Amino acid sequence: MDESVDRVLAGKYPAKAHAKRVAARIRELGYGESGVIYLEGQKTQMIEDNDGSMPFRQRRNFFYLSGCPLPDSYLTYNIEEDHLTLFIPPIDEDSVIWSGLPLSPDEALEMYDVDAVLLTTDVNTSLAHFCSVKKGKKVFAIADQVSPHITFLPFQETDFDVLKRAAEESRVVKDTYEIALLRRANEISTKAHVAVIKAARSAANERELEAIFIATCMSYGCREQSYHPIFASGTNAATLHYQNNNEDLVDKTTGEKRLNMLVDAGGEYRTYCADITRVVPLSGKFSAESRQIYDIVLDMQMTSLAMIRAGVMWEDVHSNSHRVAIRGLLKLGILRGTEEELFDKGISVAFFPHGVGHYLGMDTHDTGGNPNYKDENPKFKYLRLRGTLACGAVVTVEPGIYFCRFIIDPYLASPELGKYIDTNVLERYWNVGGVRIEDNVVVTQNGHDNLTAAPKIPEEIEKLVAAAQ
């Protein structure tokens, strides 16, 4: 593990700096110079008709301004006085019997980057004090994230509009601490991907490899997954977000081992996500058709990475990926025509239907991307990130090519579009399923910093698979 990451993470999560950033964004948007920011953490939620609690996931905007993963917590930030207060639950004697003593206010003050820690029973009193003694007139909160017992009546003005936007826009550019968390998530997830690659040849079922991935992540400190992992063997990889992860790696119909396993998985480290995709040949060596598609996708990714720097238009990176895909598929004979007419007609969308990447942070599809899902151009409809890249933003770069009958068949059935696809050549590639290669990168002023070290050169992957036998 990178020791420089350990040195950064030895300090406190920079909640106070984040609170200042959000307040500054509120001012920039024209909502005033003063007031109090109010946020609630996620509540403990019980499983329906059961006495057990559901898996807990902290609200991301609350964590951004507190660094606190505790459920049932609150915070206030006095903008004018630059004072951040965390409210944590008091001791519940019944809970202590089962769960032990909770964090005390003194312990929380030592642990988190806040100015004061009080109990949640003090929230309303604290808000009233802000109005009466501090002459506070305005409170900023997020709609539908205020508990019924909380009162804003002492305030002259309550704003439910700007805080969510200000927090989400502030989260786009990461600071040194956040990048260290993302780097650690990638380090651990890389170990898990390598473990999966080494086990791929001997595994019998998709779920075996999923179990290896999750166990490796947990053993190194990622107790949670960033999202439901995708372990898609053979033609299952043609489904972009395949979820079942339970099929045998030997095809029951043909009795033959499936060609590849697409693994899209990443561990979550202290609320920050990794999102990595690799493709592994289950036999230990890519088939000729698999290798041809893999090389095109790798070219798509490498040319995309070469374009990334502060100020670049993400739509340009995405469009270039389509052009690389078109050139590659033309060379194989799957497509016919000219690059320009294929690009203008959107034929490559049949094989590359999603965006080339998205923001990454506390959420896998992180905030601030400004997607336009109503875009009538199919090349851009599912692009989760639009506009120019900012220095310090973290993005995924994940081009792919898929052989999904549900997506491709309408193109083949179209008199206008079907003529651009050679079905005889296409027939040889259905069993490839899909290939996607995904890295996580920090945008820098003149380029990028790739956080992902998982092997992606095909010879390296084949060597790892073979060495495990």
UniProtKB/Swiss-Prot annotation:
GO terms for molecular function: manganese ion binding; metalloaminopeptidase activity. Binds 2 manganese ions per subunit. CDD domains: Prolidase (cd01087). Gene3D superfamilies: Creatinase/methionine aminopeptidase superfamily, Creatinase/prolidase N-terminal domain. Its EC number is 3.4.11.9. It catalyses: Release of any N-terminal amino acid, including proline, that is linked to proline, even from a dipeptide or tripeptide. It comes from the Eukaryota. Keywords: Aminopeptidase, Hydrolase, Manganese, Metal-binding, Metalloprotease, Protease. One of its GO terms (biological process) is proteolysis. Mn(2+) 2 binds at residues 264, 275, 438. Its cofactor is Mn(2+). Catalyzes the removal of a penultimate prolyl residue from the N-termini of peptides. Belongs to the peptidase M24B family. This is Probable Xaa-Pro aminopeptidase PEPP.
